[in-house]
């Protein structure tokens, strides 16, 4: 068992989103991405079976897909097949927690 405080472990970078590997196992991976306003994780996909969840735990922005956007704010969770194009854009400073199963 382990405990991690994401507010202490991962901060922000003025030039690009900041990534922190929270957990990696044969079963799932957890990542924390911190974005300054205007930064983004570009739309992308992975050629494999599995699912991804993106949970906003601070800030506001947009969940991105190939052809559209959806508002994203604190408490929102996007769940998608990992092969479906997905991304995130921050409108304010924003922290998200991404879970990938199985891990890539």
Residue ranges and their predicted role:
Residues 25, 36, 56, 81-83, ...:
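A short, compositionally biased micro-patch
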Residues 31-47:
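Conserved short histidine dyad/triad with adjacent acidic residue
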Residues 82-104:
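Ligand-binding loop in jelly-roll beta-barrel domains
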Residues 49-62:
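Glycine- and acidic-residue-biased ligand/ion/polar-headgroup-sensing regions
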Residues 1-31:
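A short, N-terminal "cap"/entry segment at the start of jelly-roll beta-barrel domains
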Residues 57-58, 73-74, 92:
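A cytosolic small-molecule/anion-sensing beta-strand core signal
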Residues 66-82:
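Short acidic-glycine-tyrosine-enriched beta hairpin
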